[in-house]
Amino acid sequence: MASKSRRLSGLEISLIVLFLLMTAVSVALITVLALKQESDKKEEVTPEEPSPSVTPPEKPYLIGVGRADCTGPVADLPMMGYANTDQTARGLHTRLFSRAFIVDDGNKRVVFVTSDIGMVSQRLRLEVFQALKEKYGDLYRQDNVVLSGTHTHSGVGGYFQYTLFMITSKGYIKPSIQAIVSGIVKSIDIAHRNLRPGRIFINKGQVADSNFNRSPHSYMNNPEEERNRYEFNTDKQIVVLKFTDLDGDGIGLLSWFAVHPVSMNYTNRMVSSDNLGYASYIFEQEKNIGFLPGEKGPFVAGFSSSNLGDSSPNIRGPVCVNTGLKCDYINSSCPVGGKKACIAFGPGEDMFESTRIIGENMFKIAKELYGSAKQELHGPVYGAHQWVNMTDETVQFNSTHTGRTCKPALGHSFAAGTTDGGGEFNFLQGDTEGDPFWDGIRDAVLGPPSNETKACHQPKPILFSTGEMDSPLPWHPAIVDVQIITIGSLAVVAVPGEFTTMSGRRIREAVKRELEVKEPFTNAEVVVAGLCNIYTHYITTYEEYQIQRYEGASTIFGPHTLSAYIQRYRGLAKAIAHGTIGELPKGPEPPFFDEDKLFNQVRDPVADVAPVGTTFGDVLQEVNPVYKVGEIASVTFVSGNPRHSGDIRDTTLVTVERFHNDTGSWEIIHNDASWETRFHWIKGLAGRSQAKVEWHIPQTAQAGTYQIQYFGHYKQTTENTTVITPYVGTSAAFKVARSFYYF
């Protein structure tokens, strides 16, 4: 029987229509909301990376980054920076690295390398280019490769060919320079292999509470109208480059900031990358998740030196340590204790904490700038380079007035050192008179400076007339590199020494004026890269030179040094802007002295001897059974001389390992490049020595079972043979707890 259909009531029809309308409206609202969210995503630029959906408006650069270990010997060799031959290495705080950045515009390429070393010497640069030429022919040349040192004072020396520098670092030390040359070349190799299309963004900001002018009396001698243009007597600006691939993934950071890496003071005996190196370390550790420091993590963060000549990280300033009173403003000395009692201190309780604080300050601002960088660099890259005889430069001030540079000479205040450390005898900063006693000794031993040199350097009283001393080799260089590289609108002025704050400002302005007459430099950003290519001490302004504090006494080419450099760098900038680089004269090539003419005062280490009843790697002082986070786990081993380990690059002397119960295996959580580990070598008598390894247990350490291992080599000799043997020392297993109530 057919069912009878029921007619819908008016109420039911109304409800159905209302339901359909509400459904349609809901769908429409959801669609609009989805489209709006998608639109917002497209418009939003995240703070960490640029949107990969945005196609570069111009042909992208080829960019490559690379990092390589350049740590040399960590024992028994002089450290380079404080010019103290008694400050020899006795261990390892952090490893030293070379970081290379290559940019290619499709026609030309430029390379910037920043290395955790005191400075780049002429000898080092020439040996690097020998190695590069063997590998790459004329691809990497004097004009397109900049080599810069961070200026850590806690690296080993021995990579110079001029007598003065060889004296302070006990000669030309082959294992030291080989490690640095190999590390620099390897970092370029890695960057070369990793070249890919990418983008470069630039940003800048200010780093507070991280640098302090250690020679304010000199700075105040600059013209008042010039000083009034600046808020501070040191440069607070940090410039950051952000390197990404075309998908927007970050691959590198390169920055420049003006601060001396002397947070690790002159009492330090461990090789260390200091504050700039620590900033690189924590940035790379944050980016390279899952990699131990120094391993092949792909992200490279270079924190480079700038015009740091008078810029100290010891921001609490100098005080008389025996009274707590302020030091003398003019010569930085104290009524009791003289200049030795006048010491500047960093923000931390000790040099390690000060290093961490200054490094973190740079890291935090660089991270913010990296994340917010939106201004992109576009345009060609250029490199311009000349060799200049800085002993004979004529400076044209105007149509009627000229000046001359001088043969190198160091003033009496050079021997006074700075409030950051160094200095001997009764020498004081700010000395424009000299001392007949020391002049007499100099004349008897080294000979007096010529009248011409004395007149040229006025008002500097000359202590060492190094430009007139050439035994056994010249004491100072005469031929100096000047160089500029550009990437789009960015110009990097590679300077051969330590420019003071105002010197750096003047040269930046001069280069900027020359560049801005042409595209793409109409809004050029100019940075000073310090300690590049060759070391020539300090470069002050003419006015600062008159005061003759340490920096002025160390301006070796005389009062017109800065003016001569400005003239030369203006010439390079003009050639870049007008496309006439090829017309620049190459200049006189520097000497490359035969290795057999370079002296070495460092003796080979003697054979190692283990105490009776022990062997190498045995534990002499064992770890405690239990530690809590924040404490220091320490173990001492029978050791050989670390120099017997030879080339220690890409290895580790120390590991901290955590035991995994589930797998029954040990996992390395720290190596000797880690901030948390410290390796102390304790030299004894007659070939005996010890190695003390510390693990500064971080608050983030997991509770569990740990051990410390130490890897070394010992040397044994017989009448006809020398045998080098590896060994391993292992601590007892110990517990780490969040507190002592954990167990």
From Swiss-Prot:
Keywords: Calcium, Cell membrane, Developmental protein, Disulfide bond, Glycoprotein, Golgi apparatus, Hydrolase, Lipid metabolism, Membrane, Metal-binding, Mitochondrion, Secreted, Signal-anchor, Sphingolipid metabolism, Transmembrane, Transmembrane helix, Zinc. Its cofactor is Zn(2+). Its EC number is 3.5.1.23. Residues 40-60 are annotated as: Disordered. Residues 49-59 have a biased composition (Pro residues). One of its GO terms (cellular component) is extracellular region. Plasma membrane ceramidase that hydrolyzes sphingolipid ceramides into sphingosine and free fatty acids at neutral pH. Ceramides, sphingosine, and its phosphorylated form sphingosine-1-phosphate are bioactive lipids that mediate cellular signaling pathways regulating several biological processes including cell proliferation, apoptosis and differentiation. Also catalyzes the reverse reaction allowing the synthesis of ceramides from fatty acids and sphingosine. This is Neutral ceramidase.
